[in-house]
């Protein structure tokens, strides 16, 4: 992406489920960096009244709605991970809409650089719209452990998500920077702080 005067230098942040990318993202926010999360944008585009939600209900039926009209994400997740073709259809519907929301928001950034967080940064091709890719990496056993502690889900469902996500080796192949998050939160913060200073240097800001 060509960086114009009103367009920020964008860092793409990604990692598999349970890798700790959300904790890394929170640290960037604490450091004053403008950030948008693809998961947040994905919620925005399927709010009641938005066209994407109507398309999802038309395809999957009213069983994917909660009583208040909101999308039942757990029900939809079970449907798409049981059927790769359905997952591909959903991604084809949502990715362009999510991208529009994200880059419209990032264009308003006032920090020296901005962070775009997405678990599908590589798969969606949106890493091409960033200037640098940071991958948060963790051993798969630790990803499984963290996800089971955090979410009300089964080991089988977590494994299905891991299997559906991009292979770890392929994700790392696209990385400009890698943070191995296999210790505690303080260790993660230390690595993010160091990279933050580096990114400020790249942007000509003050470390």
UniProtKB/Swiss-Prot annotation:
Cellular component per GO, a single term: cytoplasm
Predominant localisation class: cytoplasm
Pathway named in the protein's UniProt entry: Cofactor biosynthesis; coenzyme A biosynthesis; CoA from (R)-pantothenate: step 5/5
GO biological process: coenzyme A biosynthetic process
Keyword Cell membrane recorded: no
Domain of life: Bacteria
PROSITE patterns (UniProt xref): DPCK (PS51219)
Keyword annotations from UniProtKB, A to Z: ATP-binding, Coenzyme A biosynthesis, Cytoplasm, Kinase, Nucleotide-binding, Transferase
Cellular compartment(s): Cytoplasm
Protein's job: Catalyzes the phosphorylation of the 3'-hydroxyl group of dephosphocoenzyme A to form coenzyme A.
HAMAP family in the record: Dephospho_CoA_kinase (MF_00376)
Protein name, per record: Dephospho-CoA kinase
Organism: Pseudomonas putida
């Amino acid at each position: 992406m060509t960086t114009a005067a009103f367009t920020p230098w964008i860092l793409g942040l990604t990692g598999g489920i349970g890798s700790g990318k959300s904790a890394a993202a929170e640290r960037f926010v604490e450091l004053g960096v403008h950030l948008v999360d693809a998961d947040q944008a994905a919620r925005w585009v399927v709010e009641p009244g938005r066209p994407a939600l109507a398309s999802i209900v038309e395809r999957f039926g009213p069983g994917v709605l909660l009583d208040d009209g909101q999308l039942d994400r757990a029900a939809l997740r079970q449907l798409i991970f049981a059927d790769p073709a359905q997952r591909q259809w959903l991604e084809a519907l949502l990715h362009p809409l999510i991208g529009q929301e994200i880059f419209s928001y990032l264009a308003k950034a006032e920090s020296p650089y901005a962070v775009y967080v997405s678990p599908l940064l590589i798969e969606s091709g949106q890493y091409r719209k960033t200037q640098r890719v940071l991958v948060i990496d963790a051993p798969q056993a630790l990803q499984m452990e963290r996800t089971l502690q955090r979410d009300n889900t089964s080991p089988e469902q977590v494994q299905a998500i891991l299997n559906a996500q991009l292979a770890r080796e392929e994700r790392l192949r696209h990385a400009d920077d890698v943070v191995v998050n296999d210790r505690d939160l303080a260790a993660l913060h230390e690595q993010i702080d160091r990279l933050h200073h580096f990114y400020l240097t790249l942007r000509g800001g003050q470390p």
